[in-house]
Amino acid sequence: MTEEIKNSNWRLRNGQIIAAKQMTASEKWFDIKLDDGDLDHEPGQFVQVELYGIGEAPISVCSSPTKRGSFELTVRAAGRLTRHMHSLDVGDWVGIRGPFGKPFPVKLMTGSDLLFVAGGLGIAPLRSLINFVIDNRRDFGTVNILLG
């Protein structure tokens, strides 16, 4: 495998579910460990989750990049793949591509007061940024979260 392919975000990586919890009737949380290292994402990015024989779907990473060893996803059962994900549990494997997407401009936020506004599952992609801010609390001003 060439170095370029090895380091490509499009390369399919194996991820094992190391924890899972049904949050609501339609949302399930997963903690996933890649078999070849950390995800190395930034707040606001997403991954493509592949279930072998089912397909792929984009899902926002909801853990902070400061969390090492695994990453978290919250999945709403809305389509074929995401409904099937709700049947998965600890020990099951999924395919992961990514991270993808333009991250939040964290460096521009440094020293500023922050207001997070979200509704429903919209808090999941913000959770990555919120946890990053908590983990780097001294770098930010007042933090407020409005959840509807």
Question: Language-model features: where?
Answer:
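Ferredoxin-reductase
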Residues: T2-D92, G148
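FNR/FR-type flavoprotein reductase catalytic core
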Residues: E3, R80-G148
